[in-house]
Amino acid sequence: MGDSVKRRGGNAVILIFAEWGAGMVNSTGMSIFAGNKYRPSMKQADDSRAALCLQFLRDIAVHNNREWFHEHREEYDAARAAFESMVAELIARITVFDPAVQYLGVGDCTYRFYRDTRFSPDKSPYKRHFGAYINAKGKKAFQGGYYFHLEPENCMLAGGSYCLPSDVLRAVRQSVCEQPEEFHAIVGSDPFHTLFPVIGETHVKTVPKGFPKDFPYPEYIRCKDYSCFHPVPESFFTSADWLERSAEVFQVMKPFLDFVNAAIDEAV
């Protein structure tokens, strides 16, 4: 998944918002008080890491300039550390059902916070989200992986393959066309369809050229990407069981990734 976000990001996909008060603490045992000041605390709340990240992201959305960022670098460092600790735990939990990701480090899955503004009319220097793409093949691979995204008012778990070259996209469509019932059994199952009711973010209007017009599941080959998105409420990542619930979502996603990645492996 890529480094830019458009409600979802790059060859990836995205997540989160939460409210917290003066009594919250971060993962290092630092308490957050009015005015974004940090003081030592003896107690750590279960949801403190996501809350800390989201508060900083709300702040940077309002003050997206270098002067403010440098004045509040301590807050950024604390939020970044909190996010990275969440990513490390998520990698370990995904490894239970997808051992291929076990050798990934946090740095293999996360992105720079600084935006590339060279070709964008928006010259804001910093992103407004934290995202992690957990992909055994790497962040820039065509193969799909698991995406975890924290962003105020844009909360989701997602995954799949995004921005595929035309020949690779055609290979995935061809695989779906050759194994329609197998693919439908995955994405049409109750657990998957409940979490991910739509496959792909964008679609062509009709069945692509070269594919049968009478294909029984035309919506599966009209996809311009093979990704899936699961929006969640702000309370999801501030709950004590966010890790277990995230792993459950990604485990349901895995057969879809396996199918798509098998087609991509043959094409690249």
PLM-predicted stretches and their roles:
Residues 1-12:
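Extreme N-terminal basic, low-complexity initiation segments
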Residues 53, 58-111:
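Active-site acidic/histidine clusters and adjacent loop/turn architecture
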Residues 95-141:
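Hydrophobic/aromatic-rich structural module bridging two neighboring secondary-structure elements via a short loop
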Residues 14-16, 23-26, 32, 37-38:
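Short, positively charged and aromatic/hydrophobic N-terminal segments
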Residues 43-59, 66, 87-90, 181, ...:
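Long, solvent-exposed, polar/charged low-complexity segments
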Residues 136, 161, 230-232:
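Short, structured patches in soluble enzyme cores that scaffold and shape functional sites
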Residues 152-203:
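Compact, glycine/acidic-enriched structural inserts
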